[in-house]
């Protein structure tokens, strides 16, 4: 596997004295043999990495994971795989735990760097390696004493869900596969990367860590350690449980089950900063999928708030992730997607947002596209959605006897159809709103003539349907408080309201002017409270 060479067929590597019959000597021979073919800095990195994981020195593990491993990858393995398990095993005394963790990085590197992506056997082996890891930590009677940095735990869960998504798309593309590959996918390995396996693993991590009970205890001001259990008391299990909740959010979003996507996060107060949200990539990913789910549920006010808050966070914390180029690229792409989704939501549900976000929308020329959407250009809606939506997957793979077609786009086209049906119902509302904002009273017939100069009596009756649609679409469920993101109260999102008496429309501007005095009073009180606390500190 390593380097694409078949070493067994090369006579120059044959050594008749390789095996002596003494296990100790044979192991020493293998260690020296593989080490001699490996760059010295790679060999020493693997030895030190294994030692750091054995000893649980978090600082060293994090430094090697975040800095040394990417640097060696760039220098030695930019377009090729790292050494495989057979080469690494003898160097690290075949340490079982380290080899599982190493293979997680090994297959992740193949997915990210190898041109053409991983082969089928590599995808399958990666799945079974994840199974080995999760069985190790979940099936144990007692907690496994393993220390890994939170960033690795997050990226491990995130990569687990990504490889499921990637495999589902690979499996749905039948046009580039032979009959033998289809046989392997549909018969021999039908359970590999199955949705049931993914959900089972993530829910098991949530359950074993008692993370939901811990989050509920925190929200009630209680000590989470009292409900954490033997496993949940350890940071390793606790953070895996938290990240698994976000993984479940992503999985349900990819399947198009938006209600369940929000439901699974119920212990997490989505709109409040959490003590567990110190990993920027996790916080950004959470907000992206929550905001998208809200948008698809027609809860535009909540979607706008979610996108605005996280985009402000990204603006203010760029320096936290700018040192890791691949993470920077990923976050920048997700931010660009959220600006597209925010533009869609603002067209469908106009409201005020932070001026710095407005400035970005102006600088990146989103306003031109937003104007076209306001004028009913469905193609712009479609292109924005296709660019910004997740890459949906189907929970069921194509059958073994299915026609040899490409089924990858089917889930996305279904979600696009659902979204565009909603847009078509609303595409005329901006025009209606623009006329209503000009008047306090307006006859129905006059409004009908504004919309269509050749309006007939039938058009006036159709106008009533349009006005009813306006009322309905502008009234949305909006979250106000509580741990459940599904809760809320119905509120009108429009800056105007109206009622119809006979043939006359009575319009009221409900826009509330900003009360800056309250804002400054709150800030002054907060500053005074902070000042009192500082004076009490003894140095």
UniProtKB/Swiss-Prot annotation:
Its main location: cytoplasm. Pfam families: Paf67. One of its GO terms (cellular component) is eukaryotic 48S preinitiation complex. GO terms for molecular function: translation initiation factor activity. InterPro entries: eIF3l, PCI_dom, TPR-like_helical_dom_sf. It is found in: Cytoplasm. Residues 306-514 form the PCI domain. One of its GO terms (biological process) is formation of cytoplasmic translation initiation complex. The keyword rRNA processing does not apply. Keywords: Cytoplasm, Initiation factor, Protein biosynthesis. The keyword Zinc does not apply. Component of the eukaryotic translation initiation factor 3 (eIF-3) complex, which is involved in protein synthesis of a specialized repertoire of mRNAs and, together with other initiation factors, stimulates binding of mRNA and methionyl-tRNAi to the 40S ribosome. The eIF-3 complex specifically targets and initiates translation of a subset of mRNAs involved in cell proliferation. Component of the eukaryotic translation initiation factor 3 (eIF-3) complex. The eIF-3 complex interacts with pix. Belongs to the eIF-3 subunit L family. This is Eukaryotic translation initiation factor 3 subunit L.
